[in-house]
């Protein structure tokens, strides 16, 4: 490991210290390493051709006109990306789905965009992780 020195303004350092304390880091270096790893992983997953994993979560109204069947159709159209899907009934009207995906990050992003853009889908979020060799 190498030691590096960085300069931070007072407000940013205070924010880093607060984050470190909330998340239980023993020191600033651990927090900065995790922040950097996260930024690098995010960058890697935005490149077409990168293989990885992702979790797509979203809430939708199951009674919305043909929405459930459109989502299923989209899932079948991209079946090679799907590892598993969890379906939860939140209340009488809403369902939460969580899909674990694996494949080319460009294809995963396209699939997520197709699902999230459907009318009646809310709170769509895609969390990507690059595949580590």
Curated annotation (Swiss-Prot):
Cofactor(s) the protein needs? Ni(2+)
Q: State the InterPro entries in the record.
A: Acetolactate_synth/TF_NikR_C, ACT-like_dom_sf, Arc_rbn_hlx_hlx, CopG, CopG/NikR_regulator, Ni_resp_reg_NikR, Nickel_NikR_proteobac, Ribbon_hlx_hlx
Its name, as the record gives it, is Nickel-responsive regulator
GO annotation, biological process: response to nickel cation
- What does the UniProt cofactor note say? Binds 1 nickel ion per subunit.
User: What is the source species?
Assistant: Escherichia coli (strain SE11)
The role this protein plays is:
Transcriptional repressor of the nikABCDE operon. Is active in the presence of excessive concentrations of intracellular nickel.
Read off the HAMAP family from this record. NikR
Q: Which residues, by range, are in coiled-coil regions?
A: none
Q: Which PANTHER family would you find in this protein's record?
A: NICKEL-RESPONSIVE REGULATOR
Known CDD domains for this protein? RHH_NikR_HicB-like
NCBIfam families given for it?
A: nikR, PRK02967.1, PRK04460.1
Q: Which GO terms describe its molecular function?
A: DNA-binding transcription factor activity; nickel cation binding; sequence-specific DNA binding
Q: Which Pfam families match?
A: NikR_C (PF08753), RHH_1 (PF01402)
- State the UniProt keywords alphabetically: DNA-binding, Metal-binding, Nickel, Repressor, Transcription, Transcription regulation
**Which family is this sequence assigned to?**
Belongs to the transcriptional regulatory CopG/NikR family.
Q: Which residues bind Ni(2+)?
A: 76, 87, 89, 95
């Amino acid at each position: 490991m190498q030691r590096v020195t960085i300069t931070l303004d007072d407000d940013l350092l205070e924010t880093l210290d607060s984050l470190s304390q909330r998340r239980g880091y023993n020191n600033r270096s651990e927090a900065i390493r995790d922040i950097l790893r996260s930024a690098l992983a995010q960058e890697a997953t935005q490149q077409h051709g990168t293989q990885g994993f992702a979790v797509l979560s979203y809430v939708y109204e199951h009674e919305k006109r043909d929405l459930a069947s459109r989502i299923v159709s989209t899932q079948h159209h991209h079946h090679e990306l799907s590892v598993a899907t969890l379906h939860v009934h939140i209340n009488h009207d809403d369902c939460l789905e969580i899909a674990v995906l694996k494949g080319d990050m460009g294809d995963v992003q396209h699939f997520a965009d197709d699902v999230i853009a459907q009318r009646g889908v809310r709170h769509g979020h895609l969390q990507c992780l690059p595949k580590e060799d």
